[in-house]
Swiss-Prot record:
Tissue expression notes: Retinal rod outer segment.
Pro-sequence residue ranges: 72-74
Protein name, UniProt field: Guanine nucleotide-binding protein G(T) subunit gamma-T1
Subunit note: G proteins are composed of 3 units, alpha, beta and gamma.
Amino acid sequence: MPVINIEDLTEKDKLKMEVDQLKKEVTLERMLVSKCCEEFRDYVEERSGEDPLVKGIPEDKNPFKELKGGCVIS
């Protein structure tokens, strides 16, 4: 997709672009923010038991666990 410098466009072209964008946006389904937040909260809470950031990673399956023993140079 080519980059368009908006300053190089005529006023008519700018208005046409705006109308095209508004035509795209008018077809989008809109929802109340309160309803979306409620659904999002429910979604997160339903899956929190599977989330490793919430429940943690078992020590035996943790790929980032520090290896025991090492070389100490004195």
